[in-house]
């Protein structure tokens, strides 16, 4: 949701060639989960400075994440589930590469498959938040 460079022509080429694509890090290194809704947890990936940096988690980014979480809640999904469903919408992306550090995270991620469809209003709301 945050890194959409594939939409600038590459996805069209893949469609023309009959090829699928795999979305890497559809949860934005954990940002598109409920983990960062209240800020940066001390034991988080961002606090450790691994791939995700504290500097990447600005108040504006947190505001976007919270708004997306609100849309997800209206859909009856967790933020992670909605983010995965959004990546897989329309069938252009054939797989989403997600990681899980617990069975609970895996089950939550798989829950996205129960509701992959979006209404036009939901997509418009998401686009408005991401703009």
Residue map of PLM features:
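Beta/alpha (TIM)-barrel catalytic core signal, keyed to glycine-rich beta->alpha loops juxtaposed to Asp/Glu
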Residues: 1-130
């Amino acid at each position: 949701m945050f890194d959409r460079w594939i939409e600038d022509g590459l996805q069209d080429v893949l469609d023309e060639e009959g090829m699928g694509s795999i979305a890497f890090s559809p949860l934005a290194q954990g940002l598109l989960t409920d983990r960062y809704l209240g800020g940066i947890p001390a034991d988080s990936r961002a606090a450790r400075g691994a791939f995700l940096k504290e500097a990447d988690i600005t108040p504006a980014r947190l505001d976007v994440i919270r708004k997306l979480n609100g849309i997800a809640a209206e859909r009856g999904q967790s933020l992670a589930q909605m983010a995965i469903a959004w990546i897989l919408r329309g069938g252009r992306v054939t797989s989403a590469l997600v990681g899980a550090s617990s069975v609970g995270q895996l089950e939550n991620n798989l829950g996205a498959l129960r509701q992959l469809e979006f209404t036009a209003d939901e997509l418009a709301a998401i686009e408005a938040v991401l703009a």
